[in-house]
Amino acid sequence: MSTQKGDLIFKPYFVQRGMGPNLLNWAYACDENWDAFYSNISSSNDGVVISDTAGVEKFSVEVRWNLEDFGYIFISADNGGEFYELPPAGGKKELNLNFELAKSRVFRNRRRIEKHKTGGWIPSYEVMSFVHLSEELFSDAERFKSNNDKCAELSQKCLLYGMHASEKIELEKAKYEISKNKIRKDFFIGCDARGFYQMDPELFLELFTKQFNYATITYYQISGNYRDFEPTEGDLQFATRDVVYNELKKNNITIEGRPLYWPYKTVTPDWMRNKSYDQLLKYIEKHTREVVGHYGEGMYAWEIVNESHDWANETQLTPEQITNITKLACEVAKDTNPKVHRLINNCCPYAEYVQLKKWGDLDAKYPQRTPIKFMQDLVDNGVDFTISGQQMYFPYRDLSDIIIHLERFEKFGRPVQLTEVGASSGPNKTSIDNGSLEISNEPYIWRRNWDQELQADWLEELYTIAYSKSWIEAVNWYDFVDPYSWIKNGGLLESPKGEKKASYDRLLKLQQSWGLK
């Protein structure tokens, strides 16, 4: 049955001063729960157009829009929280994109303020100044709705103050919670420990243990960073990992091993990629028991699966098969050592890949799940995990979007870890000279072009929000040292020589301000 209806058009009005680009050439839609779904949405300078939502009645549109003096960033239009519906088949409805973005942000800020007030927080004069400016400009934009150009200009200004207000609301509320709560001595501030092999080990331990109380050790079957863990099936190379494990233990660092199953393109050997589903089940059972058993109770947690919400899927399994593999691995890990936590790690928090229909570089063969839908499927199928994990590399979203997404994990009733977070410190002479990270000609993404202090700002603000939430137990920065970081120039150290970036010092001062150091 056809689900095609009429055209809903979001017409952009380019009031920006600069050359752009001002609107990304693709967009996506989300349902009322903010889960991305596949639709026929398209985006161009002529407009964002959608006419087939595959039966989803109410939806938002997610566009990357250049909001000068804030950033070229993804922003939601959700009709002020009421969401959109398609016009009847054969019909057409046109909306002013600028106005819809502004309206949606104004109404969100109202909801967030009221929500936070119930906990005793009172917004400051500074916060309310931004809120009032955005509200007044929104009222002006409403009065000029018949004049699209004028309405768009006022809406853009409204959105600017509204976005700044959103971030200030969340940060101020977080600081309020921190000020009234007890020091969280059990809060984990962590990082991956691969730096042990990327720089002088003694220097690594000096700088790492001064900063972190939590570390992850990776067990990729094949890896470009250091010795492969399982290049040949069954030939497990523990020795390299055991060295750093033992050193971290000597320094009283809590350790997580990761991952037991991650079928991503760069770490999946052909012998695994070519296994049938039944063969994978047998392998997962044996592998999990052997790896978890090797460390006994020495690990705090094992990451059971990574990015398995139909994103990392070189083994090309169905959603049901992935759920079953996850369940089996959790059962075996618990049976092997019930005292060790079982963590599920998710990437791509906003699930743009659902619209792009991609498993990494592969075209997706089956319907895909967002991280939240994947986690709900695990709960519904009785999968016995104990920690919910979400990566949060700078997501081309503002801080308000980040915390609202993370709040969705509360319903699963497990502690939440921000398993991998990171942002760039921007290009430097070395990255420009070797071409690994050059100066961009596009509008900046967030506040200004990335530099060391902006990286430190984002780190400080994200960690502040996370620390204020009792249900978030850890934040893990990825990675420690450049040029080996996943995010280009995303390390806390400039090079293996150990030069500290502003973000390294900022994180240390932040912990001191909380009484953790």
Model-derived features: where do they sit?
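Amphipathic, heptad-repeat alpha-helical segments
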Residues: S2-W34, F70-E135
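Conserved, mostly hydrophobic/aromatic
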Residues: S134, A215, L248, V291, ...
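Active-site beta-loop-alpha junctions enriched in small/polar residues
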Residues: D192-F196, Y220, L260-W262, I304-E307, ...
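An acidic-aromatic substrate-binding cleft motif
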Residues: E172-S223
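Short, acidic/polar
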Residues: G195-T209, L281-V292, A364-V379, D401-I402, ...
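Substrate-binding cleft and catalytic face of glycoside hydrolase catalytic domains
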Residues: K210, Y214-P231, A239-Y350, N428
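Aromatic-rich peripheral "rim/lid" segments of glycoside hydrolase catalytic domains that contact
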Residues: R273, H294, E303, S308-L328, ...
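Glycoside hydrolase catalytic-domain groove-lining segments
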Residues: N225-E256, P319-N345, E352-L356, Q368-P443, ...
